[in-house]
């Protein structure tokens, strides 16, 4: 069987080597690239991200990443955001009182968690919908690895009778926040599947198999 082609978008942010290895193990033919044509040609695009929202957006814009993501989604081509790669899909992020515009694929704001201990670092369970594709075959007590202090804490996209409702997965650390979103061709996780052991490997296999 032909392996699905996946590009890891190289825009100066993200754990590219770990993500690349994890995606290869998940059955993908992986290339790391900042070339728009290569990123548009593959079956699936992964947008990683670590660090500050503003820095990630600056790096993304430098490689025309917003346009790449938008063009893929306009054609129904799958995109997966990871950690800050999920956060930048929202309208804006607020860090230390400074607001930065995101890709605006989803409405809403990424804000600091109101939690007694930050960053939220370590293993945590999530609450996924029964019909999730990403979490298919996993138990309710499955844990994933998080490292973050900011997250989207509300889902602000209004229902639309003409489109399937997004599948929302939640987690808690001081407050409830979005741990993952599955919205047509656009999916994202706040946790790091490439650092989440067998559970993360299963999630990536599920995504690759869906391409």
From Swiss-Prot:
Biological role stated in the UniProt entry: IGPS catalyzes the conversion of PRFAR and glutamine to IGP, AICAR and glutamate. The HisH subunit catalyzes the hydrolysis of glutamine to glutamate and ammonia as part of the synthesis of IGP and AICAR. The resulting ammonia molecule is channeled to the active site of HisF.
Alphabetical list of Pfam families matching this protein: GATase (PF00117)
One BP term from GO: L-histidine biosynthetic process
A GO-annotated cellular component: cytoplasm
Subcellular location: Cytoplasm
Keyword Cell membrane annotated: no
Major place of residence: cytoplasm
PROSITE patterns, per the entry: GATASE_TYPE_1 (PS51273)
Pathway: Amino-acid biosynthesis; L-histidine biosynthesis; L-histidine from 5-phospho-alpha-D-ribose 1-diphosphate: step 5/9
Catalytic activity reported: 5-[(5-phospho-1-deoxy-D-ribulos-1-ylimino)methylamino]-1-(5-phospho-beta-D-ribosyl)imidazole-4-carboxamide + L-glutamine = D-erythro-1-(imidazol-4-yl)glycerol 3-phosphate + 5-amino-1-(5-phospho-beta-D-ribosyl)imidazole-4-carboxamide + L-glutamate + H(+); L-glutamine + H2O = L-glutamate + NH4(+)
List of catalytic residues: 83, 192, 194
Species this protein is from: Nocardia farcinica (strain IFM 10152)
Protein name in the entry: Imidazole glycerol phosphate synthase subunit HisH
Domain named Glutamine amidotransferase type-1: residues: 5-211
EC numbers, comma separated: 4.3.2.10, 3.5.1.2
Assembly behavior: Heterodimer of HisH and HisF.
Keywords, ordered alphabetically: Amino-acid biosynthesis, Cytoplasm, Glutamine amidotransferase, Histidine biosynthesis, Hydrolase, Lyase
GO molecular function: glutaminase activity; imidazoleglycerol-phosphate synthase activity; lyase activity
InterPro entries: Class_I_gatase-like (IPR029062), GATASE (IPR017926), Imidazole-glycPsynth_HisH (IPR010139)
């Amino acid at each position: 069987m032909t392996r699905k082609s996946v590009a890891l978008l190289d825009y100066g942010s993200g754990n590219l080597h770990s993500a690349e290895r994890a995606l290869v193990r998940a059955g993908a033919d992986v290339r790391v690239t900042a070339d728009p044509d290569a990123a548009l040609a593959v079956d699936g695009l992964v947008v990683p991200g670590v660090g500050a929202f503003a820095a990630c957006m600056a790096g993304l814009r430098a490689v025309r990443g917003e346009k790449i993501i938008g063009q893929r989604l306009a054609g129904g081509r799958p995109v997966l955001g990871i950690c800050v790669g999920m956060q930048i899909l929202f309208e804006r992020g607020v860090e230390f009182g400074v607001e930065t515009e995101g890709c605006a694929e989803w409405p809403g704001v990424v804000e600091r968690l109101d939690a007694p201990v930050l960053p939220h670092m370590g293993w945590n369970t999530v609450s996924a919908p029964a019909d999730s594709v990403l979490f298919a075959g996993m138990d309710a007590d499955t844990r994933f690895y998080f490292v973050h202090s900011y997250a989207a804490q509300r889902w602000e996209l209004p229902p639309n009778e003409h489109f399937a409702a997004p599948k929302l997965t939640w987690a808690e650390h001081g407050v409830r926040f979005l741990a993952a979103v599955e919205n047509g061709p656009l999916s994202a996780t706040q946790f790091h599947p490439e650092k989440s052991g067998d559970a993360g490997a299963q999630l990536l296999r599920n995504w690759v198999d869906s391409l």
